From Swiss-Prot:
The active site is at H63, D106, S107. Residues 1-26 form the signal peptide. Its main location: membrane. This is Lipid A acyltransferase PagP. The record marks K72 as: Role in lipopolysaccharide recognition. The record marks Y177 as: Role in the phospholipid gating. Pfam families: PagP. Belongs to the lipid A palmitoyltransferase family. GO terms for biological process: lipid A biosynthetic process. The lineage of its organism: Bacteria, Pseudomonadati, Pseudomonadota, Gammaproteobacteria, Enterobacterales. It catalyses: a lipid A + a 1,2-diacyl-sn-glycero-3-phosphocholine = a hepta-acyl lipid A + a 2-acyl-sn-glycero-3-phosphocholine; a lipid IVA + a 1,2-diacyl-sn-glycero-3-phosphocholine = a lipid IVB + a 2-acyl-sn-glycero-3-phosphocholine; a lipid IIA + a 1,2-diacyl-sn-glycero-3-phosphocholine = a lipid IIB + a 2-acyl-sn-glycero-3-phosphocholine. One of its GO terms (cellular component) is cell outer membrane. InterPro entries: LipidA_acyl_PagP, OMP/PagP_b-brl.
Amino acid sequence: MLKVNKYVILIIAFVSQMMFSTTAQASFSATVSDAWSTLSNNVTQTWQAPEHYDLYVPVITWHARFAYDQEKIDNYNERPWGAGFGMSRWDEKGNWNGLYLMAFKDSFNKWEPIVGYGWEKTWRPLADDNFHLGLGYTLGVTARDNWNYIPLPVILPMASVGYGPATFQMTYIPGTYNNGNVYFAWLRFQF
């Protein structure tokens, strides 16, 4: 009798795990599907009905000093000369959506293009609605000289502070020792 109970318990445990796993999988699939739908709708709406056209001006790259040998720091470019163009809109929740194309001088002083989509949750904490803060992400594709200009996908965090049509946007490229760990910022002017 005791052996039968062990088998019954094992079967019940196995079946319940399978049921839970199937439910969790369905929930995860629905979440991914909803996220993809939201992203593609935001990109499409920004492309088809932009409120603004944007000028991008890269202003700084900074290599985290704790993550690099001094010799590398001394040889890196931290003035990312370049420019970019984009289109953007504020959605019904007041959040920023933008499509952009930018080219700038990378750490090795070689041209690096990037094209992508950015989204920021936007807060207007002051009585003056012109002042805004943002926190979000960017998805895009870049290409670098040291990777033979092979297209590389990027998913990066993004933050901003702005007043009216001028916004200081930034990201951080994570990495390992002597690779990545770069703060990159640019000015964005809306027209």
